[in-house]
Amino acid sequence: MATSQRKILVTSALPYANGPIHLGHMLEYIQTDIWSRYQKLRGHECHYICADDAHGTPIMLKAQQLGLAPEEMIAQVNKEHQQDFADFNIAFDNYHSTHSDENRVLASDIYLKLRTNGYIKSKSISQLFDPEKSMFLPDRFVKGTCPKCKSPDQYGDNCDACGATYSPTELINPKSAVSGATPVMKDTEHFFFDLPAFEGMLKEWTRSGALQTEMANKLDEWFEQGLQQWDITRDAPYFGFEIPDAPGKYFYVWLDAPIGYMGSFKNLCDKRPELSFDEFWAKDSKAEVYHFIGKDIVYFHSLFWPAMLHGSGYRQPNSVYAHGYVTVNGAKMSKSKGTFIKARTYLDHLDPEYLRYYYAAKLSSRIDDLDLNLEDFAQRVNSDLVGKLVNLASRTAGFITKRFDGKLAKIADTTLTEAFLAKQEQIAEFYETREYGKAMREIMALADIANGFVADAAPWQMVKQDDQQEAAHQVCSNALNLFRILVTYLKPVLPRLAQDVEAFFQQTLTWDGLAQDMAGHEISPFKAMMQRVELDKVNAMVADSKENLQVTADVPKTAKPEKTVESSNVSSEPLVDDPISETINFDDFAKIDLRIARIVKAEHVAEADKLLKLQLDIGGETRQVFAGIKSAYSPEDLEGKLTVMVANLAPRKMRFGMSEGMVLAAGPGGSDLWILEPHEGAQPGMRVK
């Protein structure tokens, strides 16, 4: 249990209910979920809340296009969103919708309090009106030429080319994005929130530590420009909540959207009577509230939202944490390149734990954009999770099960355990401050130490000697205890792996239990916990993303797909590229002695571009082999693996040393090489027949 239990409410921005979740969205939900899981792991009371943002003109128009009622469409999208999040192991405590009774009541309550307190003004404005559709046009439904830089085809609120903001009436040659008609000006009465009245309060709050420094600096620019009255009104037809005492007038979506955080929590409180809504949202609340958002919506969350809360008698959030955008392979996500990847498309091909880890490994507390480099993604997951983390257990657990009754030994030398536990507070601080990348580097550095310990001790050699049985038991038990500590550290990031490891150890992994004495503890037989990322699956995901676009655009599916992962040169017809060799007789083949070998150690060779130096255990002896697989594997990917070698190949003297055999690999070369990996039941020294 945590020393001092905190009460925490944490939210992610509400996804808009007019389309699917994609990998750009997933960055935020993974970031927030890791933080929420960490808080719970430390024993704090933490509630992770979200909802669909379900109002606005875009939803109304899309529902019309689909021939659905808006309520029907948002219900379908909500179901899809929740399934995608669940399959990515995003553990919301409540997921709701802004189109709810709770949100309607709270939005009206906040509006009426603001009106009573004198913060709502009414005035007549002239607005663009679509004469063909008989509707007023929101900013994003007017397009024209930017009045500042003269770039064409820009939205009615800001220019993507120069970043300028303006009103739709300032556009040059405006057109309705709904019908294409030239809009006309029409007068209408709108209600405005008096944002300038909160300038002093907002300047103090934005510099209180509630925002990252970069965001606080950006807000200073907006303060210098002067805060403006905020139009919170939209005219019918509109899908949203009608404003009290104003028939035909609706709340602008950005008024009720952040109130959706409160609405979702109220819904949770109604389901769990022990929870108090006021304990988290009252002005004198001692609980903590944190919002995780993208950098594109900072203005709403750091100016309008805290001002609305303050003006209506509610508390402000402790912090608003913004993150950057996701790029793929160094560029903006692209539908034509297949890098605009939907969450569901990813899930059809790859393990969600892979992306959770990769995002965590690259996330910091800053607002920098994050690049999902698909080649680096595969290499990092294979190296860190498969080659370092899971490999630590896979190469030692079998000995405990088969030779030591499945029970761990009392560890005599606890030096490594103490070193691992000494990193506990540092890793905790990294999680708390959202420096996940630093936490992952710290954890993987420990994994390197643990794997080096196992490689140096070589328990697979010890078990062959009668007088080394206890030493082997010690080494394997020590390694598994270190593995347990590592996975506990990673539990917020890899919840599914943590569950598998909990089943393996037959106990729950807890932060407070990190230092537990595991002597005599019985483990379950080890089962494979994570597979390598194969580039063909990554390529298939990218190809499917293109195919989805082609279907949407009604492009023939027979179009030849572009190459996906740039480093991949794998032919779909290997026999054409590399025909079968001439026939040999059996006697010639029988001369080749193929043996199972375990890669005990792998290291780079100085001044060699293609070679790795391998130390191979073939049962009764150790061989040194230089293998031309550097372009496909990192040394840490290989250590502990079983492979196949030619054991009776004449030694070859090389500039770097003597090579005493050859390991077998398949593939055309470059990064497209795969060493042969026998079934785990094979043992070093066994002959391949």
UniProtKB/Swiss-Prot annotation:
Its main location: cytoplasm. Binds 1 zinc ion per subunit. PROSITE patterns: AA_TRNA_LIGASE_I (PS00178), TRBD (PS50886). GO terms for molecular function: ATP binding; metal ion binding; methionine-tRNA ligase activity; tRNA binding. Zn(2+) binds at C146, C149, C159, C162. InterPro entries: aa-tRNA-synth_I_CS (IPR001412), Anticodon_Met (IPR041872), Met-tRNA-synth_bsu_C (IPR004495), Met-tRNA_ligase_1 (IPR023458), Met-tRNA_synth (IPR014758), Methionyl/Leucyl_tRNA_Synth (IPR015413), MetRS_core (IPR033911), MetRS_Zn (IPR029038). SUPFAM superfamilies: Anticodon-binding domain of a subclass of class I aminoacyl-tRNA synthetases, Methionyl-tRNA synthetase (MetRS), Zn-domain, Nucleic acid-binding proteins, Nucleotidylyl transferase. It is found in: Cytoplasm. Is required not only for elongation of protein synthesis but also for the initiation of all mRNA translation through initiator tRNA(fMet) aminoacylation. Its EC number is 6.1.1.10. Its cofactor is Zn(2+). A motif ('HIGH' region) lies at residues 15-25. Homodimer. It catalyses: tRNA(Met) + L-methionine + ATP = L-methionyl-tRNA(Met) + AMP + diphosphate. This is Methionine--tRNA ligase. GO terms for biological process: methionyl-tRNA aminoacylation. It is an enzyme of class 6 (ligase). Residues 588-689 form the tRNA-binding domain. Keywords: Aminoacyl-tRNA synthetase, ATP-binding, Cytoplasm, Ligase, Metal-binding, Nucleotide-binding, Protein biosynthesis, RNA-binding, tRNA-binding, Zinc. A motif ('KMSKS' region) lies at residues 332-336. GO terms for cellular component: cytosol. Gene3D superfamilies: HUPs (3.40.50.620), Isoleucyl-tRNA Synthetase, Domain 1 (1.10.730.10), Methionyl-tRNA synthetase, Zn-domain (2.20.28.20), Nucleic acid-binding proteins (2.40.50.140). Belongs to the class-I aminoacyl-tRNA synthetase family. MetG type 1 subfamily. ATP binds at K335.
